[in-house]
Amino acid sequence: MWLFALLVTLFYGVEGSIYLPQKLYGEVTSPLYPKPYPSDLETTTVITVPMGYRVKLVFWQFDVEPSEGCLYDYVKISADKQTLGRFCGQLDSPLGNPPGSKEFMSQGNKMLLTFHTDFSNEENGTIMFYKGFLAYYQAVDLDECASQPNSVEEGLQPRCQHLCHNYVGGYFCSCHPGYELQKDGQSCQAECSSELYTEPSGYVSSLEYPQPYPPDLRCNYSIRVERGLTVHLKFLDPFEIDDHQQVHCPYDQLQIYANGKNLGEFCGKQRPPDLDTSSNAVDLLFFTDESGDSRGWKLHYTTETIKCPQPKALDEFTIIQDPQPQYQFRDYFTVTCKQGYQLMEGNQALLSFTAVCQHDGTWHRAMPRCKIKNCGQPQSLSNGDFRYITTKGVTTYEASIQYHCHEPYYKMLTRAGSSESMRGIYTCTAQGIWKNEEEGEKMPRCLPVCGKPVNPVTQKERIIGGQPARPGNFPWQAFTTIYGPGGGALLGDRWILTAAHTIYPKYPNKGKNTNPRTLVFLGHTNMEQIQKLGHHPVRRVIIHPDYRQEEPDNFEGDIALLELENSVTLGPELLPICLPDNETFYGQGLMGYVSGFGTTGNRIPFHLRFVRLPVADREACQRWLWTKKDTSPFSQNMFCSGDPAVQQDACQGDSGGVFAVRDRNRDIWVATGIVSWGIGCGEGYGFYTKVLNYVDWIKKEMGDEN
């Protein structure tokens, strides 16, 4: 027993302090716990937690010799230079002063636990053994900002001059608006030179309001809110700034600026009127001198979305879509025009228009105007013209014109079933385009009228040797010179129907003419006059593929087309002939006319002549060829005309001209044949290319111009 006491004395000492490591939690026990503690001992355990925390201590086991007033053995708890209690006994015993479940709390970060034992533990002569105690401690946050009237530990009470903010393990200080925290982190000094307010509403006041404001201030309170908002200011009572009865604001003054303008300088005891600044940026400058005891000012600022003026149309044709009772920042409106009118921004035509309300309360673009759509001058019509149905010269929306062709030489091409009343009528639409109800934007076409001479030949008797033609008798007649004089007939307004052998003649020992000089004359019955009119350049020469130049006696496929470089202008002496469409044009005895500048009496006439001939019997023509011992093929692509008894026929120079027959049912003239070949001049029958058999080929080559 004595050895045990010696060891304890050596470890703890009779009197001494035990410093526990600084931790956030831990446990404290009596010496040798849970074995009985030694006698005659006094130790102090120092519990320390980090700064900014307090110490909380709770006993879980407590078995210390009980005594009246805990005079023998005891545990004493101290903190903040105060004794929190002196305890002995057992936790559940009424003897002594046990701590029970009480929590002990320090105000600072340190707590002292002193354990004292006397020289013995006897009770009525019997030695008693006590286990001592087991306690747990932990660090809890210290609210440095809380009022601590009982704290006596120096430096514990925070010294924030204005505002104190607690956090776990510490605190920090801040200042009222208009003051600046000093380097000591606790004291505040007036500083209001750059106060900024960005909330959409709030309060702004002078320092210490409603207490007297400090002297020598140079304050700048800036309100900056989102673009598109406007700030409203409402001053509250009391309003009190030093002033003078005779001089305006000589001492202290409040100045208000917005949009670069001074909205006023205020002082005295009359609060300013409510102000709508029409700006999202407002500055309040507050200056004070070195003296005075006025209470200052306070205002409540609010914001609302800035408004733009109501849009107004500049003319009666402008339509503002879905107008609103008011327009605010970022709102927009769209504008259209009444049908037939065009949006115009200056001189620029617009497809659409939208204006947006800007942050400064203005529209981002000016209101446009609506100008009536103008379709412009109608296109000129080839071989036709137009007239105004509505006011002459007016080409704007709903104006109407009517195209017409130069009749009787041209007629307007229309689709099947189209209305006669709407033919050629075009109206200026709301889109600014001339349109026909049936044809749309497509321009009308004036097509040549075929087979309608204004002065048709009326001779009914046969004429021996032919006779001169009068102007307009055969307006389709063409005079060609390639290797010699020849004839042809006008188809449409740019094609010449002729015989292939006039271009590639069947001369022995002559190669194909690959680049003939082809001259075409049109529009007169007099040779001198027709040449004065000038020749028409040829763009293309098209020979039928069945034609064989190298076979001198074979006139199969003796047909050709000349495409002129330019269309000719039709008139009374220049009209096309029609193409046949049935076999009735080839009946025996049917009379036809052949015209040309062919040889008469071994000379070329100076005037167009014609002859009236009947379609001959095919078998008679074939027998006549046999009598002449002519072996030239007389195919189904040919026919013959004439009468050997009267010695009428086409002659040299007439080749390529056409055999013209009048269709009495339709009152048109048709080219049923082309002067092709024969034996001599006026000695019997003449042979012609049968045009009906080549109509499909002709139409194919002419395309949409046939």
UniProtKB/Swiss-Prot annotation:
Keyword Phosphoprotein: yes
EC code(s) of this entry: 3.4.21.41
Domain called EGF-like: residue spans: 141-189
Residues the entry annotates as binding Ca(2+) 1: 65, 73, 118
Disulphide-bonded residues: 70-88, 145-164, 160-173, 175-188, 192-219, 249-267, 308-357, 337-370, 375-428, 405-446, 450-578, 621-640, 651-681
(3R)-3-hydroxyasparagine PTM positions: 166
Protein name per its UniProtKB record: Complement C1r-B subcomponent
Organism (species): Mus musculus
Originating gene: C1rb
